[in-house]
């Protein structure tokens, strides 16, 4: 019997999301206009809380849908205007170009990145050294490339290797269901479980590595570019400005990587079983023999394009998004990717998040129009200039650990800039606050998958169920990094940021605009 019209509409609304989630969103949409009639300020904060809720529930439904519905309603009832949303989007066009073109550009360099991580995995036998290598490689790549792409590449390597061994363990060459362990005998299951633990730890080290590297440069994370633009910094300026905090934090993060592996804490320390290594090495040897001259040329070309990318970013030869577009053009032209559909696949990863970011800007417009953060900013600005840095760092960190970094970073840098333009703080203090906001937004966010887009991407990937990486386990494995990075970052903001920045100015390396 066919279901009723009402039931069909209910099932279609937000698709496979739980009924309680659908009901919650409908209640939000009904309550918001009523509260807005009574108190626009309270309604604005309620909208922000609801939006953060949709981000926290990203595994139930992609936030673009519920967040977008809330944003559309906010414009309709007058919390902000469509014109203000357009202004916010226009002001952050560089970030949208970064997401559209840079992420797509790196897609065409995946073969090179896969080659790098495969060589690391099979060449280094020491687990401590391998973990450190993955963390450092992910950090370096994320300083110039998109963190999601770096994690996507590591996931591709892990899924590929897991599939190779799973087929051997199940004695089925055409094993397509990697989650089915029913054909694997007891001995192989023990080895497979050890292999899962090994892959889990490597994925977490790589994920944290993207956060360590991503905070250091203006292209490492989307919010970095927003902050750099607001402060008027180019690539080199941004790196030097952040270095009093980011360099010590990077060292602390790498030491944490070695420590948890050495002491086997928090689920780390599992080594690659020798039987698995033999199978993977045999497969890699066969792959290398089958690699044609055309394949080798592709790798060389991608490496040269990588050098161009780093050089163009460092010298600020063009806007970041346009450099990304040049990477797309060069990579496709020189590696023979000419089909429209093949090129189109490169954009599937970035465009949903680009649309979500536009929704972020709608909520930011509401925050500005309703002056929601004015009381918090007034409270922070009443403190001494030195205390302001730590307070901004802490407030950013708390919100970033449960919400999206781009959203949080955009809100706080806008408020700090408004305070500077009104004369509440000096330009010099504003530049120090920009560093506190950027590091506070990036570092504590490793606490949960909600805070780090790369972690959320890993959690929702095909790899997570294969290696038994749940939300709770990810939070637990991230805990030592969360504590170390957050505390180290706070101490650096408190004690090293101002004096080292002053020394850089005296040396003539940086200057206040």
From Swiss-Prot:
Family as reported in the entry's similarity comment: Belongs to the NhaB Na(+)/H(+) (TC 2.A.34) antiporter family.
Biological role: Na(+)/H(+) antiporter that extrudes sodium in exchange for external protons.
Annotated compartments: Cell inner membrane
Bilayer topology term: Multi-pass membrane protein
Membrane-spanning ranges: 23-43, 52-72, 97-117, 120-140, 144-164, 202-222, 238-258, 303-323, 348-368, 391-411, 447-467, 475-495
GO MF term list: sodium:proton antiporter activity
GO cellular component: plasma membrane
Taxonomic source organism: Escherichia coli O127:H6 (strain E2348/69 / EPEC)
Protein name: Na(+)/H(+) antiporter NhaB
Swiss-Prot/TrEMBL keywords: Antiport, Cell inner membrane, Cell membrane, Ion transport, Membrane, Sodium, Sodium transport, Transmembrane, Transmembrane helix, Transport
Lineage per the UniProt record: Bacteria, Pseudomonadati, Pseudomonadota, Gammaproteobacteria, Enterobacterales
Catalyzed reaction equations: 2 Na(+)(in) + 3 H(+)(out) = 2 Na(+)(out) + 3 H(+)(in)
